[in-house]
Amino acid sequence: MSVALVAASCAGDSEIVAPWEVQFGSPQADTSFGVAAAPDGDVVVALATEGAFGQPNAGGRDVALARYTNEGLAVWQMQVGGERNDSPLGLSVSPDGFIYVGGFTEGAFAGENAGSADVWLAKFDRDGTEIWRQQFGDKGWDRGFDVTAFDGGVYITGYTASILDLATNREGFDGFAARFDADGNLEWISQVGTDAADWGQG
């Protein structure tokens, strides 16, 4: 199953023009979860793949990244994963060109798994080389959903059925937000929720 990437621009009051489009993927199921523009005009795509997307599949769903120029030409693609399902759900490119990706893992993607699913966050350079990767969570189901990068680091938000900040999980899912510096060090994490289900997305 392939992923399509389409460039679009407005040619008038209502007409949408697609200067180019590309289709790419593995022979297995591929699902795109994020598209982000780089400072140089390139486009970065994050997806989950059950196939081989640049490297052999490590097991279940792997995380894959691809970079294209603003003319739709492939620059590189890469793939990383553990023995179980790993998915990217958030993608952001910092003003200085570093790529940050976050999501969830059901395995040991960047350390020992604490429970059902853990949050993970990773940083890559503009060439797709991994700089660092972090994993955190507790015994419940934890997911990272949205990532926002800035010059000095990155924010990640999501939801947790665990206790991430020494607070008490109120009921079901709580929302959380965390900030990491550019070297991957956790600066702070905050968890908030009500008696109902609460998600952090954005």
Question: Which residues does each PLM region occupy?
Answer:
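Bacterial N-terminal signal peptides
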Residues: 1-7
